[in-house]
Amino acid sequence: MSIREVIMDYLENSSKKALSVEELSVALHMNKAKDYKVFVKTLASLEAEHLLNFTAKGKVELAEKEEAKVVISGIFRANAAGFGFVSIDAEEPDVFVARGQTAFALDGDEVFIEIDKNANALKGTSAEGHVVEIIRHDVHQVVGTFVALNDDEKEQTGLIGFVKSRNKKIPYRVYLENEGLIPENKAIVRVEITHYPDKEFPQTMQGLVTEIIGQADDQGIDVLEVLASMDIVSEFPKEVLDQAEAVPEEVPENEIVGRVDYRNEITFTIDGADAKDLDDAVHAKRLENGNYELGVHIADVSHYVTENSPLDKEAYERGTSVYVTDRVVPMLPERLSNGICSLNPRINRLTQSCVMEISPEGRVINYQISQSIIKTTERMTYDAVNQMIAGDEAALENYAKIADSVKIMVELHHILEAMRKRRGAIDFDTVEAKIIVNEKGLPIEIRKRTRGIAERMIESFMLEANETVATHFEAHGLPFIYRIHEQPKADRLQRFIDFAATFGMQIEGTSNGIDQKVLQAFMKKIKGQPGEMVLSTMLLRSMQQARYSENNEGHFGLAAENYTHFTSPIRRYPDLLVHRLIREIGEGKTPANILQKWEDKIPEIAEHSSHRERRAVDAEREVEKMKKAEFMEEHVGEEYEGIIASVTRFGMFIELENTIEGLVHISTLKGDYFNYQERMLALIGERSGLTFKIGQPIKIKVVKADRMTGEIDFEYLPSELDLIDKAAKAKKKPDHKGRKKSNQSLKVKSVAPKSTDKSANKSKNGRRADEKFEFDKKKKKSAKKPFYSKAAKGKFTDKKDNGKKFTDGRKKPHKRG
């Protein structure tokens, strides 16, 4: 049970009508400092939701039944189609909010909702509700394209134009008065919101231009617009740059004192050829006792970025560096990342080192985590090391000084890889796109990014260091920030198990308690099979997102009990924090007040860093989609073979060899009626038996690509690749209209849907905005009842209440069936 459920359950069953906060905390064993803070915060939340009251004497009691409302606070997550979901907390399933029931909430807003329909674990349906109040707006600025009104419209309205938001989840136009900055038509601008949509003006917002970012035809403006729309800023404040400039370019002798000296080790960096921020170096050797020594040396960024300094505050705000196709938005100024904190060859550099003694079985026997100094022997690239591993004589001769070290590293890498496989780590080996752009930022080539042994080897060493550092802090019971990856949720995993069964793949175990080794064995079984890419992707989608936390929940994907991020403090704030914790409390001899300080601070840092990471990933994906669509604009009309990557009721997404994905809309499949088989994730033609299912090869033609939306449309082309389901075709007899009956699947007519309100059913390129389909994807099958289920019982039993008005005049919506 969640904390809120525990509190409510105790009060409902208590012999006392009211208890003091202290009595309640002691009774629930939540009176220790760490738990008490969360306990009090939960009480405040329950009071705000009218589930608890505080008496005149400050005691806690349940709200009177007639006063109790099923009102919950949460974060609204909008869908571009107009509906959304409210996230309550990590332990509770999301609540579906239909289009028209959002009270004009925007994506990210904190809201109060009332529950209209409880979740049904047996049917696998989510709870449904409606927004009753917006507590706090999350969106304060909008970035988009300015569209000027003509002179007549300006005179009639007193407005100069409107801005179309780059964010698809903000469907409203933002109108501008003749104040502040006046942009030219089609300019890309940033607008401060001054008025949000409401009942009087339900389809519009109003604002003032605070920045003219550029013109639509400026070079690189497309990427800049995406970054600006997500509040990702390249420029650093002056005080931050000033602090960076004050950092010396060389390491003075007095800063070496007290550090472990690894300058005599054969230590080198291995990075991409175009990398400039070289923040990690490695050394490896075989010991006389038969074990291996692996040293992972990371730039000591925390030595220069001190706590609460301008550099630190800016790094915290950014959270992470953002990597898009043609640029990097760094977390720290280049003066640091490419200068004193870059482990350039043959130069003294301050580091934090994790040096491990590892057995031939891959077990860490001993380790030392220390402040250190190194002087790297070489600056190596992945390509050069891969050539050495492949036995290239020229490469081996050019880098003879490190050749023995590389050989030992390869041995150790294979040992560590085998160790992780034995314990159940899952290797998804996902395929990434490499987008090549010209000097104008235009995409000229897109191909799969390759990973050789060198790339895997460095990743393997970084994993080992991260795990060792986390294990150290866990063993000493110190406050820490962990990188956690929780076990998959049962409902999502069950959908994958069902899906794999359609490929004839049986997965042992149950969705409630599956072991990593089972999934690892499954990945090994599908290796090299036709459906490998699709099945691997679907399994990855069934996993939870990794995140940062002050609580150690382990890492499911790595099958690791302890894990953190230690190896990239130049580009990730949690790594910088880990370095700071090593420096300040890592030895375990720390005053209680310092430990308490970090116990209080780490939860907020973890949550903020997770949010910033998701923002960076969203930006990177958005730019990638845009550049892929821009690339395909030059290939409209061309034909390709691809693989069906996913199937929905409105069509299917096809992935090409170079990772580009496009939609074949259901309305373009002519001459048959197609049934959508949700369990199989397939479309099957009633008359022809023509079948489209995930993993199937298919031939297509590119018919449209839109760089602004990032959407690409394909047209299906009949070919010898097609699959005919003869059994499906034969088992149904035609009715009087010549159609075959089906009670087991959803019938989807292969013509464009008709609607008097086109915007309600389609997006700009004709994609169906089907909220029920999207809702079905969010179904929860957990047997656990939501915490509000008791309060919800009987709330809507009075049929006379159906017409009850809210304070804003809206009628309460009828329950969905």
From Swiss-Prot:
Renumbered to this chain, the Basic residues biased-composition regions fall at 729-742
Disordered: annotated span: 728-817
Q: Where located?
A: Cytoplasm
RNB domain location is 259-584
Q: Name one GO biological process term.
A: mRNA catabolic process
Recorded catalytic reaction(s): these are: Exonucleolytic cleavage in the 3'- to 5'-direction to yield nucleoside 5'-phosphates
The answer, when asked if RNA-binding is one of the entry's keywords, is yes
GO cellular component terms, alphabetically, are: cytosol
The entry sums up its family as follows: Belongs to the RNR ribonuclease family. RNase R subfamily.
Q: What does this protein do?
A: 3'-5' exoribonuclease that releases 5'-nucleoside monophosphates and is involved in maturation of structured RNAs.
Which named protein is this? Ribonuclease R 1
Q: Which organism is the protein's source?
A: Lactococcus lactis subsp. lactis (strain IL1403) (Streptococcus lactis)
Gene name, Swiss-Prot/TrEMBL: rnr1
